[in-house]
From Swiss-Prot:
Disulfide bonds: none annotated. Pfam families: Ribosomal_S6e. PANTHER family: 40S RIBOSOMAL PROTEIN S6. GO terms for cellular component: ribonucleoprotein complex; ribosome. It comes from Methanosphaera stadtmanae (strain ATCC 43021 / DSM 3091 / JCM 11832 / MCB-3). HAMAP family: Ribosomal_eS6 (MF_00512). GO terms for molecular function: structural constituent of ribosome. It comes from the Archaea. The keyword Metal-binding does not apply. Belongs to the eukaryotic ribosomal protein eS6 family. This is Small ribosomal subunit protein eS6. One of its GO terms (biological process) is translation.
Amino acid sequence: MVYKVVVSDEDVTYQLELEDKDAKTVNGLKIGEEFNGGVLGLKGYKLRITGGSDKNGFPMKEDVDGTRRFKSLVNGGTGFKPTKKGLRRRKTVRGNTIADDISQINVKVSERGEQTLAEIFAEPEEEQEE
C-alpha cells in the first residue's frame, strides 16, 4: 500500500508518497490525530490529519467512525456543496480511520521543524556551464 500525502502549510501544498514500511505507522490513525513528520522525511515536524479519500474517490468524514463506507444525508460540508438553501443529498462517505484502502491523506503542519518546507522541497539547482 502506498499513500499519497498532501502536506498543507498556510497557502502552499506539497505532495509526497508514503511507502509500504512507513505506511504502517499511520495505519489506524483518525482525522484530527497527529503523527511525526519524520516518517515523510520532514524532520522535526508534527502533522495533523485533516482528511483524505479512498481508492474510489470517496472522501473521509470526521464524524463517521471506523473504516467503513456510509451513505449519509448531508446538507453541506464533506462531500457535497449545495447550490440552493436547504438542499440535501445522500452521499457516500468514508469513515475517519486510515486503512489499507485509503489512497490520499491530507495533513497540515501543526509544529514546524528547523528547516522550512520550501527549503526541504526546493529542487537542487544545476550548475550552468559558461
